């Protein structure tokens, strides 16, 4: 009998299977389309970042960055000894007009408390860093260093996660859930 049955084998379902299997849980993932041609994750940019408003999301972003940087070690399997997600590190620039500036200043307090490495740039100083951006109407902007944020190939990341989850004992089956009961 399985400890956990996960409905859907996209990024979230597969990551859940990986982490639970790593803890020794018996996991089964039920996925209706194992080719993932109708899944949303292959179409996404695969961004990872720390610039959020809530502390929990900032900390999750920091965790994700550390995990992504360790993919070659953490997700290595016998079948895939050199996993990758084609990571590109390039900081995110978020810009705010006067109507959202105060909210962003409050968020920066959370960034500092979480040691997120976020830098505040006044709108009037934005062209010093990014001369190609028209800063009219920009009150403030935030930016992290180029090693803290970026993007990955989500399909490659999913494949590495799934391969490792399977090696750890997770079972992926094709199927569709029609109903749930106690």
Functional labels for PLM-detected ranges:
Residues 45-129:
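Dinucleotide-binding Rossmann-like beta1-alpha1 core, especially the glycine-rich loop
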Residues 8, 31, 96-97:
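Short beta-strand/turn micro-motifs composed of small residues
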Residues 17, 21, 164:
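Gly/Ala-rich phosphate-binding loop of Rossmann-like dinucleotide-binding domains
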Residues 39-45, 132-136:
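Short, flexible, mixed-charge acidic loops at enzyme active sites
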Residues 21-41:
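Glycine-rich FAD pyrophosphate-binding loop
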Residues 1-12, 28:
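Beta1/beta-strand and adjacent pyrophosphate-binding region of the FAD-binding site
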Residues 70, 95-168, 173-174, 179-182:
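Flavin (FAD/FMN) cofactor-binding and adjacent substrate-gating region
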């Amino acid at each position: 009998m399985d400890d956990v049955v996960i409905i859907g084998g996209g990024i979230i379902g597969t990551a859940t299977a990986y982490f639970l299997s790593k803890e020794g849980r018996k996991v089964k993932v039920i996925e209706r389309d194992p080719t993932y041609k109708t899944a949303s994750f292959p179409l996404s940019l695969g961004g990872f970042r720390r610039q959020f408003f809530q502390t929990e999301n900032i900390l999750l972003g920091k965790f994700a960055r550390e995990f992504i940087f360790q993919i070659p070690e953490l997700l290595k399997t016998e079948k895939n000894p050199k996993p990758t997600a084609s990571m590109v590190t390039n900081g995110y620039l978020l810009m705010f007009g006067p109507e959202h500036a105060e909210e962003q200043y409050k968020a920066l307090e959370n960034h500092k408390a979480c040691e997120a490495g976020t830098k505040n740039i006044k709108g009037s100083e934005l062209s010093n860093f990014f001369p190609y951006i028209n800063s009219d109407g920009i009150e403030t902007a935030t930016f992290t260093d180029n090693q803290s944020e970026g993007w990955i190939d989500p399909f490659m990341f999913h494949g590495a996660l799934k391969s490792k989850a399977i090696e750890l004992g997770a079972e992926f089956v094709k199927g569709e859930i029609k109903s749930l009961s106690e």
